[in-house]
Amino acid sequence: GAVGNDSYGKTVLDSIKDFNIDKTHIRTENGDTASNRTYLTPDGDRYYKDDSWNGGVFSSFALSASDRELLHSSDMVHTTFSGPNFNDVIDCCREKRFPLSVDFDICRDFDTIEKYLDCISLLFISGDEPTLEKAKQLSSKYPNTIFIVTLGENGSTAFSKGTAYHCAAAEVSEVTDTTGCGDSYQAGFIASYLADGNIETAMSKGSQTAAQTLSFIGGFRY
């Protein structure tokens, strides 16, 4: 990825400096760091306005040859459908297969989604009842893809080869800010699933990780 050479970019890099994260593929570019101005309701639900998103240097981010080599050797690659390099990641995966996880957020264009399912291992989508039914159908058609539908306070449901797994949302005493809950769920799920390949355990870990994020302002504590 890339950050800008502004104060936000420095904050991002400072926030992860003490973690065991390989930072060699984070570029610092001339310009603004991507940002998304977030607003909260009195109940802690986050929302955005039309002008919230500023893509900054991330808008023109492109994979380098070194980045592509990293993808090819990764245990799991996670990306977003809305990211500027999504199609490049898909091309890389089709060129030389690697486990791929994709966040489709609130996308409901299942005809488009289906075009990529040949190389997606984990598919995350924020859903509702119609989404659950569609995910179940697709999971029978694409047995190599696990479909995980997050349902907010109603927990999450995953489908693998037509079989459904449900996990209740972890209980929290108070909701401070929902920003980053979906990302946290995905991180917890992926880490757990890579460890033992158990879908139900991964869902539980995702739920617990999301619940922790609900307790503070922002997507991660820094």
Regions found by a protein language model. Name each.
Residues 2-3, 80, 201:
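Residue-level marker of alpha-helix boundaries and capping positions
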Residues 136-222:
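Conserved phosphate-binding/catalytic region of the ribokinase-like
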